[in-house]
């Protein structure tokens, strides 16, 4: 497969993942935790690098020789999101601790002053949605790491 197709597919993948996450959030009512937001940024960047890069190449602003670099950048960004998803899935399964900002102890009321600091925090160590025992973070890990590996393999194979 050509580098230009891989670049476009990587950008489209990033965009699709963001749209899917937003769909789960706004249509499905699955609120994201802090680590969920961490996973979104690399997908946004992959969409910008992949699709934006192709737009700049097609407009003649960027030379075509940079297409493989754009593809690699987008694939690395997708892999980063997948790695964060794998980390979050591990936190959900209690394999290792997550960040204190979203896995700390539940709120304990000890007086009226505590109510001024209450926030609706979505915990990172509890999956809000699962399908076949796998959370959204787990699916992001599986799909994104798999897509990045396939894209990288196709780029390497395309050079020979």
Where are the regions that the model predicts?
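A hydrophobic membrane-anchoring alpha-helix module
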Residues: 120-160
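Alpha-helical transmembrane segments of multipass membrane proteins
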Residues: 19-23, 51, 127, 152
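Structural signal for the C-terminal ends of transmembrane alpha-helices
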Residues: 51-61, 152-159
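C-terminal TM-helix exit segments that contain a strictly Trp-centered aromatic cap at the helix terminus
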Residues: 16-25, 79-95
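Extracytosolic (periplasmic/ER-lumenal) interhelical loops and adjacent juxtamembrane/interface segments
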Residues: 93-137
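Interfacial segments of alpha-helical transmembrane regions
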Residues: 1-12, 62-82, 148-149
């Amino acid at each position: 497969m050509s580098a230009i197709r891989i670049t476009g597919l990587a950008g489209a993948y990033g965009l699709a993942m963001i749209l899917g996450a937003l769909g789960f959030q706004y249509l499905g009512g699955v609120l994201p935790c802090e680590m969920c937001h961490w996973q979104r940024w690399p997908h946004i960047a992959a969409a910008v690098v992949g699709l934006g890069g192709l737009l700049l190449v097609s407009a003649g602003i960027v030379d075509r020789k940079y297409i493989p670099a754009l593809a690699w950048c987008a694939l690395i960004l997708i892999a980063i999101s997948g790695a964060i998803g794998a980390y979050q899935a591990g936190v959900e399964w209690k394999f290792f601790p997550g960040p204190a900002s979203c896995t700390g102890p539940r709120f304990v009321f000890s007086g009226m002053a505590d109510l001024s600091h209450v926030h609706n925090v979505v915990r990172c160590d509890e999956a809000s949605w699962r399908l076949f025992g796998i959370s959204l973070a787990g699916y992001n890990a599986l799909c994104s790491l798999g897509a990045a590996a396939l894209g990288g393999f196709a780029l390497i194979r395309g050079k020979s």
